[in-house]
Structure formats: C-alpha cells, structure tokens
C-alpha cells in the first residue's frame, strides 16, 4: 500500500510539472512551433569527424527518423526510429563530407519513447527511460538542441542594440541560452529568407514564406559550461576568443545554427554546426579540425489523434539539455538572466594584466570623483588592484558554481579525466593484468633502444599511465604489491619494470596515486633521492589539489618519515608549497590549470588555511633555523615560503630584509630572488618592495641586483622604468648600472603579447639608458621570446650577478619556458656567497698546501698589515646552492661550509668505491608537459584534445678506476678510468585532436607525433697524466648496428576502440598522412676511410627543409635549437643516424692530447723549409723533441710550446691521424717561429703527411709610450712554407704594416689627444694612453703572396670560390675583374683594416681574375686581437675588451697620477715615503700566496720598487729595484730560495716544485724593465719613473694605492681606517713611517685617520609608514575619491527619537573578514535621513569571520551598542551625515 501511495504522489507531481507550464514570459505569450494534436516527422542526420589540413578524415555518422507528438501544451513525446550509426577513417574529396559507401549499423538503446518539456520554443527539461544510457541521452540532447527556437525575452541580455519585431518576424538580439554544449550567450538573428527557399524545401513549396533564424554562440561568455581541462598553459585561451594582449588563441571554437521555420511553425529545417580548430602541438598554422554537424529536415506534419505512446518503464528526468556525465542531477547556480552583459561575465584577470599601472590609470581617469557606496554590512567588490596578491585569475565565467561531477574521492580514480564520457564507477578487473603486460612489454623494449621509436615505447607508457589513473586505491595497492618485488631484483628488466611503474603512478595524477606514493615513502619502499624525484613531480601531475590534499601533502612533507631523509626533506617541502601556489594562492592557475569547469573550484578562493596554517609554520621554521645559524635549512625554507607566492610572505621576510634579524648578505639576496613567484602575479606591493630595494644605494649590490632581476618579472611601471634608466647614468654601483642597462634593452625587444606592457615601457625608456659599455663579467639580464603569431617556441632568460672577487658570477641562472609551461621550466641556477672561495675550498679539499717560510722579509705582507693596521675583511660564511627545475623536478641543493666538508668526504668515498667497481642503473619516464581539454560538440559527443611530451632517460653504467693524488713521490694528479655506458634519451611531442563516438565507443582522432631519440652505447676509457690526456671509446655491442640519433614526424588519422591497449602508431587502422614528393632525402655512408662507418638515412616531405638555415635566425641558441624539433609545415619526416658496427673494421677510437712547455731553449741554426717527418706514430716523444729543436733554432732563450693530438682507429687495420704543432718565441728575441705536422698512417691507404713552418719578426715595441711607436714604422714580415705529397708545396710571404693613413688617424683621434694631454703632465700610462698604445701597435694593412706548386685543380680556383661564397651571402659590396690575372701558381692578397669605421677590405688577385670585397664588418675588438703590444698577449687584450679591462687588469704608478685595477684614476705624486702598491696576506683557505709591493720616489723622476712574494709551493723572493743612473742598467737585487738558471739578457729563477720559472726579468729594447713572477701570475713594467703591474689574481683582497681590484671604483676609497673622500688622503693612508719617510705624507696620513669613516649598510624598510603620514596621505591624497571603497554609516539604535547625528561604532563584512571601526562614527537613525554628507577617514580593525569575539562585537553593534576593539588598524572612508532630518 505504501508503494502504491508513493507512486501516485510521484505521478501527480510529474503530471503537474508538465501541465502547469505556461508558454508565456513576463506576461507576454509567445507562439510555440509545436501545435497540440500534431505529429512531426523529421529526417535526422548527424556527422562528426576530425581531420588535419590534409590526409584522411576520421569520424562517425548517425541517421534516423525523428517523430514528435504534441499531446498537450508544453509537453511533447518523441522517438527515434530506425537509428543507424557508422564509422569511417579514409581520404575524402571534401574532408567534411561522408564517404559515399559508408556502411551503417543499427544503434541500440536509443529508440525509446522520451518526453520533452518546452516553454514556447525553449527546451525546459526531458524525461528518459532509465534503459537509455547516458551517452545516448547526450546524443538525443544534441539533436533536440538543434530544434530549440526561443525568440522570447527570456534571459535576454540588456543591450541597446537588441531588437525584435514579432509582427515582422525580424530582429537581432543576444540572450543566454542552454544547449548541449553549454549555457552561453547566443546571438539570434531573425530575418526573411530568399525566394529560392522552395528549392530547399520542395515538400512545403505551397506553404507561406518561412523565416530564417540563425544562432551563433559566444563561448567566451557562459554561465555554465561542461568541460574538463588540465595543464592549460598560461595565457592560452580555449573557452572563447583571445581579446587581451596577454592571451593566445589555443582553441578556436564556434557553434552556428540555422533554422527555417514558419511564422506559426513548424520548424522545417534545422542545422547546427560545431567547429573546433587547434594545432596538435598547441600553436602553429596548420590546425586540426573537429567538425560536428546535425541536420534535421521535416518530412511530414500530420494530425495526431492516437493514444499516447506508453512509457518504456521507469523514467529518468533530465533538468536541462546540457551534456551529462551521469544520471545524477546537479543544480544550476547562475545569476539573473536579465542582468547586463557587464555583470554576467565575471572575468578573472591574467597575471600579466593584474594590477598593471596603465590599466589602473585608465580606470582612475574614468572613475574620477565617482566613489563606490555600500552599506556597512554589505560587501562591495573592489577593483582588481585591491584584491589579494594571488587574485590573478582566469578566463570568463569562473564565478559559476555549477558542478558537472563530484570531485573524486581520495580512493577513487578520476573518471571524467579519461574521455569526459560516462564511466562505470567500479574497478575493471583486467586493469592490473593489462598494466603488468604493458610493463613487461615496455621494460623489454627499453633494453633495445634501436627499436624503441618503432615499438613506440613512450606512447605505451602513456597507456600504462591511463590504466593506473583508472585504478582505485585498493586496486592500485594490489598492483603495486605484485610489482614491488622487482625493485630489489638483480634482473635489469624486472628492475626497469619497477621504475617504469613507479613513474607511471607519479604521472597518473589521481588521488589514489598520491596515496600510494605516500605509502611507499612511509613504508620505505622508496627513500631519499629516489623518493625525492617522485615527490617533486607531483605539483605538475596532481589533478585535484583540494584543501585536504594540499594540507595533507604539506604535513606529510614535514613529517618525521620525510624530514629525516636526505634530499627528500627539502624536495617534498618545495613540492608541497609549489602545489599550494598553483592550486590555491594563484587564482589564475587554480582556475585555468585544474578542472574547475568540471568540479568547480577545488578549494574556496578565500579559504585562509594558507595564512593560518601553512605560512605561520614555515615562518616559525625559518626563524628557528636562522637562530641556529643553519644556512642550509634556511635556504630551503626561504625557497618554500617564496614558492607560496602570497603577499603575506612580505611580512615574513620583512624582519630579515630590514636587518632586524641578522642574516648574511647571501641569504638576504636569496630572499629577494624568491619573491619572483609573487612578482609573476604582477603584485603591486612586491613591485614596490623590489623598487625600494633597488633604489637603496646603501644596500649591498647583490641584493639590489636580485631585486632588479625580479622586478622585471613583475612588469615595472613606466615611471619606475624611466627611473631605472636614469640610474644607469649615476648609480654608484657598476653592477646595478650594468644589469639595468641589459635588462631594459632586452625587454624593449620582446615581441610576445604577454610581454606587451613590459616591452612598451622598456621601449619608452631605452633612449634614456647610458652609453657606457659594461663588461661581460658584470651583472646582466637577457630576455628573449621568439614569437610569431602562429608559433610560440618559448622564452629564454639568462641572468647573473657579478662578483667582486672573481670574473665568475655570484649567481648564474638560465631559464627556458616552453609554450606549454605554466611555471619556469628547465631552470638551472648556481648561487654562491663567493664563487672563487667555493672553488678554492673544493680544490683545497683535495690538495691543501701549507707552505712554510723560514726567511723573514724586509717588508712582508704580514709586517705591512701590522704597520698599517690592515685587517682582513670579515668573511661571510661560505654558502652556496644549486637550483634545478628539469624533467618536472624542482630541486634545491643548498650548502654551507660544513656541507662542503661532507661533500669532499663523499667524493673521496665515491672514488674509493670506483676503485673496486661501481654500477649504476637509472630509469626515469615522465611527461614534460601535458594538456587535456574536453567539451561536447553539437552532436552531443565530447571533443578531446590531448597534448603530451613523454620522455625517458635510461642509463646503465659500470665504472672502475684508479686515482693518484699529488704526494711527495708524485707531484701530479693521475687517473685511469674505464666506463661502460648505455645511455638513452627519447622524447615524443604528441598532440592528438578528436572526439569520442559514445555510440560505438570509438575514439576518432588525428594528430602529430614528433620523435627524437639519442642512444649512446659505448665503452669509455680515460687516462690522465702530467700533460697527457688519453680518451678511448669503443662500441658496447660491437656485433650490433646502433641507431645513434632518430628524428621523425608522423601526422596521422586514427580510429581506435576506447581503452585500447594498442599504441596508435601500431594500430592497423591508423593511416599516415603522406605527400607525393619528398623535399629532401639522404642515404649516405661516412667514415669509410677510417673504417668506422656512419650511416645517415632519411627523408622529409616538409617544406621547412627547403631553407634549413631559416631555423637559425633567433638571437639565442636555445630558440634555434628548439626550432629544430618543431615543424611549421607538418609533414612526414624520418631520419636515422646509425653506427654500422658490423661493417666497421675499426672497433675502437683512441684520442690523445699532449701539451708541454720548454724554457730557455738554446739551439743554433735557422728554421728551414718544411720537410717530411720520419715518425708518424701517435703521441711520439721523438717527433716532439725533433720539432722543438727545429722551432727554437736561432731564437735566444726560446720558450717552446708543443701540442700533440692524435686519433687512432683500432681494428684489423689500424688508422692513425696525427696533428702536432710547436710554437717558439722569447721575451728577449723578436723572432717567432712555428711548425705544424699533420699526418695519417694507414695500412690500406698508406702514409700521408703535410708539414708547415711559420716565421715572423715582431716589430719594435714601446710598452710605455704612445708617441714613440708612431715615430717609427711598424712592420712585421712573415713567411710560411707548406709541403704535402711528393712534391707539392705552398709558399706564403708577406708582412703586417701600419700605414701612414692609420698613423695620421691615430694622431688625430680623441683618444690620442687625451693621451697627449696626460703625457704633458708626465703621465704616460693612464687609461687613454693604454688604449692608444695598444692601437698604435696594431697593423692595419696585411699583404702577402701565395705561390703553389703541384696543387690539385680543385684548389687552384680557391679565390674564385671564396669570392662567390661572399657574393652569395650578400653581406658586402663586391667587385670582380676577370680580365686582370696573375701568373699561374700565384695569388696575391691585400687586406686593409679601418678600425675606426669597423670595416675591412680584401683584394684577391689570382689566375682566375681579381676580386675585391669592400667594407666588410669587423669586430670592435680587432685592434687588440691583431696588436703586437707586450707584455699583454692578444687573447688577453681581446678578453679585456669584453670585460672592461678586468680580465687582466693593471695598475700604473705614473708621474703624478695613479690608475687603479678597478679603473679609478686619481692625482697623487709619490713622495719619498714607502707606499703600499699592493698587499695581500695569505688566508686559512683558498689563498696561500703572500704579496707586498712598495713604491717611493727619492727624487721626482726616480721611482724605487720593493716586491715581497711567497708562493703556495713554499718558494719566496724579495726584489729591490732602483732606477738606472746614467748608462748603467737598472739595479735589481733578488733574494730568493729558488735557483738562478740564467743571468745575462734574460735572468731566470726556477721553481723545482712546479717545474716552471719562478722569476724572469729583462730589459726590453725600449729600455723598459719587464718582470714576470711565477709564469705570468704577476707581470710588471718599469722605466725608472713609472711602474705598471698586471695581475688577475688577488681580486677584492689586495690593499694599497692600486685599490681593491673589485671592479668597483667606489671600493678604491677604502683605507685601513675606513673610507676617505680625497685622493691624497687615500694614497697617504697606505704610506709607511719607515726609512726616512716624508713628513708631509705622514701629516696627510694622520688627517686621513681623522677623516675616515666606516662604510655602513642601511637596509630597506618593507612597506612601512608612520601612522601620522599614513593618515595624512589618506585624507590629503589626490585620489581619495577613487582609491578605495566608501562605506555608508548607519545607526542601529531601535528607539525612535529626535533626528540628530548619533555616534555609532560601525561594522562591515569583507569576504572572509569582519571589520569594525575603532571609534564611533556619525550616523542617522533609520527613520531619519541625512541633510548633507561628507567623507570621513576612520580606522578599522579586521579579523576572520570565524573569530568568536568579532562575531560577538557585530551582534552588539546591531543592538545599538558600541564595543571597543583593538588590533592592527587600517584607514577606510565612510560617507557620514553632517545633519539628520526627518
């Protein structure tokens, strides 16, 4: 009886729901196209297909007859009759049409009677029999959507352009309308139809003219959409049209409907077409298309007097025609349909646009004097600039709370993530079995890399991931237990099975997978490094970061099971905080990266768990580690807090940045760098903080440079950019000036729309930037985004922070951000407190010298330090870190000094392990990027786009070696290692576009797969000895051919069964897209002569290969490399590079490199023509000795360098290639000679060799004078002789000259004029003179003749071929005269350099004619490269050009001026007091040398020098130098513990420990004494009056009048007592009160002590204002009317009384807070009104709505009470009454 009553109630309710429907809206009745008592029969066809721009189409078709019976108003019965369905995958003449011979099959479970509820022409709901599956329901919804015709005003969007005339049946209006694809804005047009409509509707030609109605859907404005997405790149628009500059159109989607209907009905014809366009690889011109078309045409309209069709059993209601994923009914929550268009679309802003100053200013101008009013207890939505730091956001419609499916439970897989089609919510028993089968298959394939591309290893891995993703917790746990046994197996295949499964679980991204990983770590199945690599991938793979998961992950990262494991502890913490940023803090990624359209936002936007739980915990951890001075952990916590990217991290970091908590400069720099995540959100607060830091010149420069590098991420305002441009002129720090210039100039070149504002502001400031040139060692930031409209390769950023103690940077960072990357991807960063000290520490850990010096020096460095009270700088703790974000692994390896000690121990232990043999097996499979987007199309089937970049790294090795460290018995490091390596790296770029045919469960798709694989299967051996390195390589499998490189591109069309376990490429139904003709092909073998055969084979149909050089046009190498892996013209491509081991007779290759130097060589004779060598064997000591003797012939005290390279191919017939070169010169001889030998020794091809000799004579050098070299000719004759074959030879004779023209140009150059002015003041070696002297020794004319004998014909026209090459390149003006010939066998060359024009001209005269190439560009550093100037070498001059003279800096003690190492020049004439030129005392680690150089002038034109030097090898010397008197030589007195080996024109002392000269000195021809200590460690030139010292050591450690050598001129004001401002005080401060010192100098020294002040850092306040100024700014600020919300006060007093102003405490609620005023505010009672208003600034205090006290205060206020509150106040504006009136 109960069941009967319940059934009756349900029937009554159901019938009432239908019968009560009125076909009217707002009192107006609208006709329905369906008339009661009529039966309508339609012919229905539907097709959905996918296709590329060429090739086959893959799809399905459906047809049936559709009958509609109208039994009562608003209620229809409908039925599909004879439904049929077919699939196809074939080439079609028109890719959108169907095959003519398509075979249809009956479609079950869809021909049931169902009911439709309508309101006019609008579909309200449907009732389906429960026997109709949900996929068939969605198909029916797609058909019904095509018939929906609603011209009523229901949900019309208010817009002045809307119009509709019901009488005329014409109009155009926008409204919100629901169909199967979503509830979105729809544009209706109603218009008459052309007279030819009868041809289209022949059956109804006699009816009255129909009306044409068209509908177009705007998917950018929806109240609800049914969609699933994951991993969508930043700025990629797929829901609508990309309008903003920060957006790129990822997917183009459109739905268009056309309906022909009678004025009173019926609908004669209805067509709906959906198109989706997307490039399979995200961006590009050649889009794939998914096309869906529904066609319904009326066959007949008949009277229907028959009985209703009986229901087919129980019915299931569908409340809308939206696409469904289950039978469960969800509830819509969207705003009123009558709201305006501006209020219907709640748009999130992109991070790139968030709070941008340009937009803020525009809004401000529009809203000037227009305050927003709200009553005190209501929330007013603020401008974006007032939102939280994370409110960067997403595309439209995110406010919708409509949920399509429930978020998966912690134990459930993600059903919707697979195909966005209804799934049975139960485990498939075969999942585990199938997973194990695939695991076994691909683990076996991994052992044979040659077949991996063909067997499609990576595609099968993603099938495995799909299977794992479909498992519940229980099933996954069972599967894991069955595979975990393979983890410890010695079997390689089983071990690979475990590692592949482990990575498959990591990539699955489901909640059961996350739970399984936790279980592995807790049960120690994976530990330390292995566990770390798993955990760090989770932020990019976890698809459902709910609050529960994020807090669970964070707590897990801090649990003992994790914190006690090396590598895992830091990695887990960073992974957890990164996930929290992506899933909660960053509103943009929280919406766009995760499937919010399917499940709604996964965490509440205003949930305070980050502020209440996560951040306080991390802040406390950081505070504790700082108190314990644990730098290693502090770096990790700083990075983790920075990862959160919440604005509140500024408060956490403030005490450390402000100096209230003392930390090292390194950690402060680390904090500033880790503000980048917040800066990416364009947060204006962090932008203000960064700008304040970079503007604070009292901050340490590393902190300021880090702020500059981060502020460009936040997109600084135009005013900030202009201020920074001005700073490039006047900032005291060269590092700051350098990085600002490079950042502004590179930002101005950016082209990507996402960088539009940054580029524009930089372009406006670029012309304000200084022209000062900075060295490459200085801080810089370079940004490049190679972009065009259809191809977005990515962004490349390189930056570093310069060092004061090294040319190596303190911080070096490279970032590549791919088109699919949401975060910085492939980031490598190395950071040091001091790179120099770090390297010294590692070096000394292996070899720590402890020299002992028994002899006391007259003025040692130690003694000088005591005399002048020089104290070594207090060194900050040695700290370092390496940050890597690669393979989706974000890793931070931080070090302190104690960690480095452990590191050296670890290295030593590993070396011991290697000596007994070490094996390594590593496999890592991961998805570098993945994007999934799914949504329904017109047919009711889900469109599916999936992009993945699966990659694998497989590494197997065996290493055994022996190491010998320097000792008493052996002074050299030696090593001998043998390593077997099998290394494989493969990556697929796999894009797939299609749809799921839910009727046949067939997945129809098209796509493109790019495959790249590298395979290195070799055995390596390396031997290191003194001066010798020997490298041996041989195939690991000599009996197998090996594919070393594979590259292919496969466009295809496919049709696969759902959940197929077969890779698409291996499915027989898959069809490859091919073209008729190949663009390029290769089939060649190389290396036959060496018997090591390399085979290149392949082809391509892509037109990209017609101009391969076009791929190398970018400014950076990364972009050029990335372009090789992408195709603009997608076409079948296949290339292999193979090593044919079976055909190669050579089974091993040995490469030997030998280098040595010989000093003081004395050999009589002269260098003769080249002759053949008798010894052709590799690494021949005999040949080297012979060549050393020959090349040093005739050179006085020659120094000879020898390089010997050889390559030996070993096999049945050995093949040897040898290259030996020697070079001889001498500091006391002008001759320079060289020899070259190149030979081959082959058993099959015989012996061949080429010999060459070279000789030149250096011109006269004037080291300290600019005028003298100009007074004499600069000429350097040279000659070369080549001998090859039996009688072939080439002779070259010519000279380098300086022309009179160039001499005149030099004399008139501004540089020369500056030098002349300095010379008149007796200053010969200041900056301008140094540069001028170098240029004066540079030749500008080279002329030589080449004569040849028995030259092969192909070389005789060398000049002509060279000329044609230049002409082809087209860079320069070229001329040719084929009539002007030289004699056979001779060529003449003339090269003229114009250094000031930066061009050169080449004239070539040959037997083929004369050619001239004019005005070819030449590098600016050419004079240095060609200059003969000494004592600097050519490469040092070039390096100095690129480093601002800091590679080999110099200091000159000139006549009246001193030029410091850091390029500061100041006036100071030396007195008779000894002055410290340089002083550097040895430290405990890293610097074991001691140096002291003193200088004084006993007379005005005579300078005396004293040098004290002690080396790390235990050698020491003292040198006392006095100027020459009359014709006598310089008086040089040397006291040393080394042995003198020569003592005439070149004096040399020998270091027996290092086996090299310890001291050399000689007097040059120009009368300059040249000193060389420890083989160029210190060089000096001296002419009796002036002294110049060159050295690149002692950076930032030396003290004296030559400065600190830090590269910063501002450092050259620091004396032992502090900073002084006057140059005479600075120099006098380094004078000694010894040996008859000058009284005046001592007076200046005493004055310097009095005036000195110590440098002091003053740290930056972080967003701190005093209360008075803050209040004044609020009340007096110009933007007070527009800057914030204005609240309206009210009185809560319930007792009516006289209308007068009452004082009442006010409250309002804002998001998750309750805010209460700290004082009473004027207000009027509710029965009164205000006579006038004013704006009053009031302090308020806010706390969470969960706060018990504030909830109580709110209730008291509502009762009229006035509670007192306390807390941190902020100032808000209230609109208060001046008077109250009745």
From Swiss-Prot:
Induction: By ecdysteroid and juvenile hormone.
SUPFAM superfamilies: Lipovitellin-phosvitin complex, beta-sheet shell regions (SSF56968), Lipovitellin-phosvitin complex, superhelical domain (SSF48431)
Residue numbers spanned by region Disordered: 333-367, 379-406
Signal peptide start and end residues: 1-15
Positions of the VWFD domain: 1449-1638
PROSITE patterns on file: VITELLOGENIN (PS51211), VWFD (PS51233)
Record function comment: Precursor of the egg-yolk proteins that are sources of nutrients during embryonic development.
Keyword Transport carried by entry: no
PTM statement from Swiss-Prot or TrEMBL: Glycosylated and phosphorylated.
Subunit structure: Heterotetramer of two heavy and two light chains.
Family annotation (Gene3D superfamilies): Lipovitellin, beta-sheet shell regions, chain A, Lipovitellin-phosvitin complex, chain A, domain 4, Vitellinogen, superhelical
Any matching Pfam family: Vitellogenin_N
Protein keywords: Cleavage on pair of basic residues, Cytoplasm, Disulfide bond, Glycoprotein, Phosphoprotein, Secreted, Signal, Storage protein
Ranges of residues in domain Vitellogenin: 34-812
Annotated glycan sites: 569, 587, 1357, 1463, 1596
Gene name of the record: VG
Composition bias type Basic and acidic residues, residue spans: 344-358
Gene Ontology cellular-component annotations: cytoplasm; extracellular region
Protein name as annotated: Vitellogenin
Biased composition (Low complexity): 386-400
Protein location: Secreted; Cytoplasm; Cytoplasmic granule
Cystines in this chain: 1451-1602
Stored SMART domains: DUF1943, LPD_N, VWD
GO molecular function (one): lipid transporter activity
Tissue: Detected in oocytes (at protein level). Produced by the fat body, where it is cleaved before being secreted into hemolymph. Sequestered then by a single class of receptor mediated endocytosis in the ovary.
């Amino acid at each position: 009886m109960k069941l009967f009553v319940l059934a009756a109630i349900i029937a009554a309710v159901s019938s009432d729901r239908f019968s009560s429907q009125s076909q009217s809206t707002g009192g107006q009745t609208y006709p329905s196209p369906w008339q009661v008592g009529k039966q309508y029969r339609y012919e229905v066809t539907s097709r959905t297909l996918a296709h590329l721009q060429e090739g086959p189409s893959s799809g399905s078709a459906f047809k049936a007859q559709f009958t509609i019976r109208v039994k009562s108003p608003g209620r229809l019965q409908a039925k599909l009759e004879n439904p049929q369905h077919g699939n196809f995958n074939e080439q079609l003449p028109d890719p959108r049409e169907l095959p003519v011979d398509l075979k249809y099959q009956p479609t079950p479970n869809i021909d049931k009677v169902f009911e439709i509820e309508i309101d006019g022409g609008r579909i309200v709901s449907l009732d389906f029999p429960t026997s109709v599956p949900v996929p068939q329901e969605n198909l029916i919804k797609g058909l019904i959507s095509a018939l929906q015709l609603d011209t009523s005003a229901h949900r019309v969007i208010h817009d002045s352009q809307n119009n509709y005339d019901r009488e005329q049946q014409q109009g155009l209006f926008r409204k919100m309308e629901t169909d199967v694809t979503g509830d979105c804005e729809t544009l209706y047009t109603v218009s008459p139809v052309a007279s030819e409509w009868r041809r289209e509707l022949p059956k109804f030609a006699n009816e009255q003219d129909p009306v044409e109605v068209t509908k177009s859907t705007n998917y950018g404005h929806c109240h609800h959409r049914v969609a699933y997405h994951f991993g969508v790149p930043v700025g990629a628009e797929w829901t609508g049209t990309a309008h903003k500059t920060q957006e790129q159109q990822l997917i183009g989607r459109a739905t268009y409907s056309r309906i022909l209907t009678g004025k009173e009905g019926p609908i004669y014809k209805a067509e709906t077409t959906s198109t989706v366009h997307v490039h399979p690889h995200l961006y590009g011109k050649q889009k794939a298309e998914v096309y869906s078309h529904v066609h319904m045409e009326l066959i007949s309209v008949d009277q229907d007097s028959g009985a209703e069709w009986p229901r087919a059993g129980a019915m299931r209601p569908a409340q809308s025609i939206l696409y469904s994923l289950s039978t469960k009914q969800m509830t819509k929550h969207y705003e009123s349909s009558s709201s305006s268009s501006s209020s219907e679309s709640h748009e999130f802003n992109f991070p790139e646009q968030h709070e941008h100053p340009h937009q803020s200013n525009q809004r401000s101008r529009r809203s000037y004097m227009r305050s927003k009013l709200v009553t005190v207890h209501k929330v007013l939505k603020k401008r974006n600039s007032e939102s939280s730091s994370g409110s960067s956001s997403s595309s439209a419609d995110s406010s919708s709370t409509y949920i399509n499916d429930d978020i998966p439970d912690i134990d459930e897989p993600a059903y919707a993530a697979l195909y966005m089609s209804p799934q049975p919510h139960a485990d498939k028993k075969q999942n585990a079995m199938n997973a194990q089968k695939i695991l076994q298959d691909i683990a076996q394939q991994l052992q044979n890399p040659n077949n991996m591309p063909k067997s499609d290893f990576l595609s099968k891995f993603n099938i495995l991931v799909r299977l794992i993703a479909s498992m519940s917790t229980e099933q996954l746990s069972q599967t894991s237990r069955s595979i975990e046994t393979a983890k410890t197996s010695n079997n390689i295949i089983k071990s690979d099975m475990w590692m592949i499964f482990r990575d498959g679980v990591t990539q699955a991204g489901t909640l059961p997978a996350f739970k399984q990983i936790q279980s592995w770590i807790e049960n120690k199945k994976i530990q330390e490094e292995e566990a770390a690599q798993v955990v760090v991938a989770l932020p990019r793979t976890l698809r459902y970061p709910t609050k529960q998961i994020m807090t669970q992950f964070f707590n897990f990262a801090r649990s003992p099971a994790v914190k006690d494991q090396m590598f895992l502890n830091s990695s887990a913490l960073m992974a957890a905080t990164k996930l929290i940023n992506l899933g909660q803090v960053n509103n943009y990624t929280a919406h766009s990266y995760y499937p919010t359209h399917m499940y709604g936002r996964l965490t509440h936007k205003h949930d305070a768990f980050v502020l209440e739980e996560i951040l306080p915990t991390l802040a406390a951890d950081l505070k504790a580690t700082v108190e314990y001075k644990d730098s290693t952990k502090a770096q990790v916590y700083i990075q983790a807090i920075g990862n959160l990217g919440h604005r509140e991290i500024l408060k956490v970091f403030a005490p450390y940045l402000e100096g209230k908590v003392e930390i090292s400069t390194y950690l402060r720099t680390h904090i500033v760098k880790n503000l980048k995540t917040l800066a990416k959100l364009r947060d204006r607060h962090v932008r203000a903080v960064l700008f304040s830091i970079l503007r604070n010149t009292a901050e340490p420069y590393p902190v300021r440079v880090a702020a500059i590098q981060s502020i460009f991420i936040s997109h600084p305002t135009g005013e900030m950019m202009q201020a920074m441009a001005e700073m490039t002129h006047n900032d005291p720090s060269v590092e700051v000036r350098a990085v600002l210039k490079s950042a502004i100039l590179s930002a101005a070149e950016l082209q990507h729309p996402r960088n539009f504002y940054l580029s524009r502001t930089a372009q406006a400031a670029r012309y304000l930037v200084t022209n000062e040139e900075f060295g490459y060692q200085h801080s810089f930031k370079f940004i490049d985004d190679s972009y065009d409209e259809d191809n977005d390769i990515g962004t490349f950023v390189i930056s570093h922070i310069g060092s004061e103690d090294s040319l190596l940077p303190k911080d070096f960072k490279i970032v590549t951000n791919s088109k699919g990357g949401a975060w910085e991807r492939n980031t490598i960063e190395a950071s040091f407190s001091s790179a120099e000290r770090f390297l010294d520490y590692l070096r000394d850990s292996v070899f720590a010298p402890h020299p002992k010096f028994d002899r006391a020096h007259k003025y040692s460095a130690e003694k000088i330090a005591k005399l002048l009270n020089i104290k070594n700088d207090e060194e900050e703790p040695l700290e370092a870190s390496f940050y890597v974000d690669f393979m989706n692994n974000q890793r931070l390896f931080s070090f302190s000094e104690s960690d480095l000690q452990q590191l050296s121990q670890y290295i030593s232990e590993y070396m011991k392990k290697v000596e007994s043999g070490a094996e390594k097996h590593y496999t890592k499979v991961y998805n570098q990027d993945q994007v999934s987007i799914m949504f329904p199309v017109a047919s009711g089937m889900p469109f599916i786009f999936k992009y993945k970049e699966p990659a694998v790294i497989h590494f197997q090795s065996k290493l055994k070696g022996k190491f010998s460290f320097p000792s008493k018995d052996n002074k050299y490091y030696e090593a001998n290692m043998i390593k077997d390596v099998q290394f494989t790296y493969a990556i697929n770029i796999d894009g797939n576009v299609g749809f799921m045919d839910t009727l046949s469960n067939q997945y129809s798709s098209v796509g493109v797969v790019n495959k790249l694989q590298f395979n290195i299967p070799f055995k390596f051996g390396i031997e290191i000895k003194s001066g010798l390195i020997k490298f041996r390589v041989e195939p690991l499998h000599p009996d197998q051919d090996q594919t070393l490189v594979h590259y292919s591109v496969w466009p295809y069309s496919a049709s696969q069964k759902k959940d197929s376990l077969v890779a698409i490429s291996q499915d027989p139904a898959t069809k490859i897209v091919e073209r008729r003709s190949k663009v390029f092909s290769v089939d060649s073998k190389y290396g036959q002569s060496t018997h090591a055969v390399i085979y290149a084979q392949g082809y391509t149909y892509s037109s990209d290969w017609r101009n391969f050089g076009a791929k190398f046009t970018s400014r950076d190498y990364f972009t050029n490399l990335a372009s090789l892996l992408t195709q603009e013209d997608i076409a079948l491509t296949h290339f292999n590079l193979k090593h044919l081991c079976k055909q190669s007779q050579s089974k091993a290759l040995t490469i030997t490199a030998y280098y040595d130097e010989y000093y003081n060589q004395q050999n009589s004779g002269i260098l003769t023509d080249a002759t053949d060598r008798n010894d052709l064997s590799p690494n021949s000591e005999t040949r080297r000795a012979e060549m050393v003797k020959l090349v040093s012939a005739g050179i006085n005290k020659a120094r000879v360098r020898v390089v010997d390279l050889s390559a030996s191919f070993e096999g049945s017939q050995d093949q040897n290639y040898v290259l030996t070169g020697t070079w001889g010169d001498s500091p006391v001889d002008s001759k320079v000679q060289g020899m070259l030998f190149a030979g081959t020794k082959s058993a099959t091809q015989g012996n061949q060799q080429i010999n060459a000799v070279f000789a030149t004579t250096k011109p006269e050098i004037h080291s300290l004078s600019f005028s003298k070299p100009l007074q004499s000719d600069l000429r350097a004759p040279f000659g070369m002789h080549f001998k090859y074959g039996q009688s072939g030879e080439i002779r070259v004779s010519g000279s380098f000259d300086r022309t009179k023209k160039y001499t005149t140009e030099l004399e008139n150059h501004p540089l020369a004029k500056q030098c002349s002015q300095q010379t008149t003041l007796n200053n010969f070696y200041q900056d301008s003179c140094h540069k001028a002297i170098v240029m004066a020794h540079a030749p500008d004319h080279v002329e030589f003749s080449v004569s040849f004998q028995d030259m092969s014909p192909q070389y005789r026209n060398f000049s002509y071929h060279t000329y044609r090459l230049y002409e082809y390149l087209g860079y320069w003006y070229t001329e040719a005269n084929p009539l002007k010939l030289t004699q056979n066998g001779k060529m003449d060359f003339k090269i003229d350099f114009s250094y000031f024009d930066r061009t050169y001209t080449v004239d070539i005269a040959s037997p083929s004619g004369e050619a001239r190439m004019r005005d070819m560009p030449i590098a600016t550093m050419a004079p240095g490269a060609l200059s003969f100037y000494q004592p600097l070498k050519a490469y040092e001059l070039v390096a100095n050009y690129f480093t601002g003279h800091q590679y080999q800096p110099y200091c000159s003690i000139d006549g009246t001026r001193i030029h410091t190492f850091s390029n500061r020049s100041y006036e100071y004439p030396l007195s008779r007091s000894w002055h410290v030129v340089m002083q550097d005392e040895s430290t405990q680690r890293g610097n074991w040398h001691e140096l002291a150089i003193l200088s004084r002038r006993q007379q005005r034109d005579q300078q005396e020098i004293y040098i004290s030097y002690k080396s790390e090898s235990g050698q020491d010397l003292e040198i006392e130098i006095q100027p020459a008197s009359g014709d006598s030589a310089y008086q040089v007195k040397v006291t040393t513990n080394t042995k003198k080996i020569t003592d005439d024109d070149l004096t040399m002392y020998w270091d027996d420990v290092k086996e090299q000269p310890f001291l050399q000195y000689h007097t040059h021809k120009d009368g300059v004494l040249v000193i060389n200590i420890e083989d160029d460690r210190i060089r000096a030139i001296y002419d009796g009056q002036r002294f110049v010292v060159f050295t690149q050591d002692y950076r930032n450690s030396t003290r004296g009048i030559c400065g600190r050598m830090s590269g910063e001129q501002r450092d050259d004001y620091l004396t032992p007592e502090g900073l002084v401002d006057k140059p005479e005080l600075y120099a006098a401060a380094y004078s000694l009160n010894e040996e008859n010192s000058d009284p005046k100098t001592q007076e200046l020294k005493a004055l310097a002590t009095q005036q000195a002040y110590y440098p002091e850092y003053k740290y930056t306040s972080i967003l701190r204002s005093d209360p008075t100024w803050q209040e004044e700014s609020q009340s007096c600020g110009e933007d007070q009317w527009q800057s914030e919300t204005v609240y309206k006060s009210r009185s809560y007093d319930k007792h009516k009384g006289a209308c007068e102003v009452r004082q009442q405490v006010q409250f309002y609620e804002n998001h998750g807070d309750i805010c209460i005023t700290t004082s009473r505010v004027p207000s009027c009672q509710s029965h009164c009104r205000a006579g006038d208003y004013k704006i009053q600034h009031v302090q308020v205090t806010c706390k969470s709505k969960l706060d018990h006290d504030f909830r109580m205060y709110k209730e008291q206020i509502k009762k009229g009470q006035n509670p007192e509150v306390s807390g941190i106040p902020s100032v808000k504006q209230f609109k208060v009454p001046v008077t109250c009136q009745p």
